[in-house]
Amino acid sequence: MSNFGRRTWDREEYAEQARSGYDDRSLKATLTPIELQALKSKYTNYDHLIKGSLKDLNKRKLTANTESLSSFKRGKKFGFYCDICNLTFKDTLQYIDHLNHKVHAIKFENLFDEPLIIDIRDNDDVPQEEFELCYHNLIKDFVEVRSMETQSKRKRLLDTDVEKAKKVATKPSIESESKVSQMMGFSNFATSKK
């Protein structure tokens, strides 16, 4: 400690911590190969991960107000727990954001010596035939959907035209109206007041 109550930095202490390794390496040393494989499969299958996290969704537990102030806590507590990073999140949005975050991916790569995202390929490496096939299928699906939509619109328009024609045909025609009243659009020149 310095004279002003501040902590002084000991470079040797932090160098020793850096040489000893990170938390993920100690996690790797404490787990058996079976547990390590289970942990790996847990974080590579997102559907299974979310289903497991949501199993306690409707359970209610009381928490202190001090716990709900921050978005995550170190260690396993009530909420959504990340085994790799040893963090607990209060809601799914923060949890999923953490799973997609670079820090989580780096810890996963350090622990398992392989990338978290397995399906990575450069779009320049896609064969021309595969690209053309996907493109033609996409265009074909689009045309089919649009043709169905236009057919349904035409059918609706024809139905409304038929209904209008029926209404016009069922309207009684008044032969006794004068040409002037027909032209003006009313039946007679009488007043509506009584």
From Swiss-Prot:
Pfam families: zf-met. A zinc finger (C2H2-type) spans 80-104. Gene3D superfamilies: Classic Zinc Finger. The keyword Zinc-finger applies. One of its GO terms (cellular component) is spliceosomal complex. GO terms for molecular function: zinc ion binding. PANTHER family: ZINC FINGER MATRIN-TYPE PROTEIN 2. Participates in pre-mRNA splicing. Part of the U4/U5/U6 tri-snRNP complex, one of the building blocks of the spliceosome. Present with 907 molecules/cell in log phase SD medium. This is 23 kDa U4/U6.U5 small nuclear ribonucleoprotein component. It comes from Saccharomyces cerevisiae (strain ATCC 204508 / S288c).
